[in-house]
Amino acid sequence: MADPGDRLGVLTTTRRVVEQAQAVWIDHDAVAQIAEAFAARQVTPPTWNRELHWSDGREALANYILVLDAVNFCFWGEPRWRIEYAGAVYDGYWALAASLKRALEQGVPLTDASYLAEITRDDVATIFAGEGEIPLLDERARILRETGSVLAERFAGRFSDAIAAAGRSAVALVDIVTNAFPSFRDVATYRGEQVRFYKRAQILVSDLYGAFDGSDLGAFDDLGELTAFADYKVPQVLHHLGILRYAPALHDRLARREEIPAGSPEEVEIRAATIWGVEELRRALASRGHALDAYQVDWLLWDEGQRLPAGTLPYHRTRTIFY
């Protein structure tokens, strides 16, 4: 049975995983306790970061957000990839954002579909140059070329055309993106059934909302239908808060920083439980008079994850282009 308001199919398909999971489960008592604490603090999600995100012009900004989230995946590795920008050192997602901003400020035409369609591995290596190499460099180069080609062929080089076609619907834009751009089709198989996550497509929509302050190309009437963005950091935070529980064998593998294969039952269970851990927390907050959408709860948890104490269980390590 489909969950009400789940036109994306993410809640419905991940619910089946949570109900059958063998290695990951949700602690409902912990959900209630954390909801009480968050409601008492009147926590609010972070605002769009304009220091590290590039912004210049309406259509160029829309194309930039597409590029940003086309390569918004897999930052872990040893040694950890870092870059220096404006006198500070960044790693992870913020290194990605700063790298793209640095390149655009240096005149690299990253918002031009024809340039993207022909971008080389060396070009991409230069854009992300820093300490160490960004993981999955070849995949990022391939995806940027694919993104440029689709953008040129399907949308005349303007992602704003795709946004306009969605008619202020976040759900419609996720559908357009996942159908047009193959790298955004974040779907797994669990016990013979398809499971949808659409992490980067959904975060793309929420990033448009943030970058445009909820107006113009960032205006959507159904943002509340987005789910959490199942990545590395949010499940780590949920586990730290006690909302996610892991079977001992999986807990030990994570503690050893052992790689969890993409598409494995354990990886799919972690991601599905992340979707529902956030959804249950959202509902618990709403019942306590603190209404947030799932994507806002996700933003809040991701931001909390930037300040986890030493000794926190490491996030799961999976080599994938989807997150």
Curated annotation (Swiss-Prot):
Report residues binding queuosine 5'-phosphate: N72, Y93, K199, F229, D231, D298, W302, Q306
Keyword Hydrolase recorded: yes
Protein's name in the database? Queuosine 5'-phosphate N-glycosylase/hydrolase
According to the UniProt record, what class of enzyme is this? hydrolase
Record's keyword terms, sorted = Hydrolase
Q: What PANTHER family does this protein's entry cite?
A: QUEUOSINE 5'-PHOSPHATE N-GLYCOSYLASE_HYDROLASE, QUEUOSINE 5'-PHOSPHATE N-GLYCOSYLASE_HYDROLASE-RELATED
Role this protein plays: Catalyzes the hydrolysis of queuosine 5'-phosphate, releasing the nucleobase queuine (q). Is likely required for salvage of queuine from exogenous queuosine (Q) that is imported and then converted to queuosine 5'-phosphate intracellularly. In vitro, can also catalyze the release of the q base directly from Q as substrate; however, Q may not be the biologically relevant substrate. Shows a very low activity on queuosine 3',5'-diphosphate, and cannot release q from queuosine 3'-phosphate and from the 5'-nucleotides AMP, UMP, CMP or GMP, indicating specificity for the queuine base.
Q: How does it assemble?
A: Monomer.
Q: Name one GO biological process term.
A: tRNA-guanine transglycosylation
Molecular function terms in GO for this entry?
A: hydrolase activity
The Enzyme Commission number assigned here is 3.2.2.-
